[in-house]
Each structure stands twice: as structure tokens, then as C-alpha cells.
């Protein structure tokens, strides 16, 4: 029962963590773009 609730918690938290990672990546990208010689050049 306890492990089942942990599984549900992970299932609920997974999209939140993914969105947080995507947000942080986009923020890092936005911070990197102005300082780079060619913005959006290296992916």
C-alpha cells in the first residue's frame, strides 16, 4: 500500500519535474543567446 502511494506520487510529480527542467533549460538558453556570437546557432 505504501509503495503504491509512492508510485502514484511519482506519477503525479513526473510531469511537474519535466516542465521544471524544460523551463530551466529555456531560461539557460535565453541567458546564453545574447552573449553568444551567433544567437541560436549551436543547438
UniProtKB/Swiss-Prot annotation:
Interacts with the SAW domain of host scarecrow-like transcription factors such as Arabidopsis thaliana SCL6 and SCL21. It comes from Meloidogyne incognita (Southern root-knot nematode). Belongs to the CLV3/ESR signal peptide family. Transmembrane segments: none annotated. Residues 1-30 form the signal peptide. This is CLAVATA3/ESR (CLE)-related protein 16D10. One of its GO terms (cellular component) is extracellular region. The gene is 16D10. Plays a role in the differentiation or division of feeding cells (syncytia) induced in plant roots during infection. Promotes host root growth. Highly expressed exclusively within the subventral esophageal gland cell during syncytium formation in host plants (at protein level). Keywords: Differentiation, Host cytoplasm, Secreted, Signal. Its main location: secreted. A motif (CLE) lies at residues 31-43. One of its GO terms (biological process) is cell differentiation. It is found in: Secreted; Host cytoplasm; Host extracellular space.
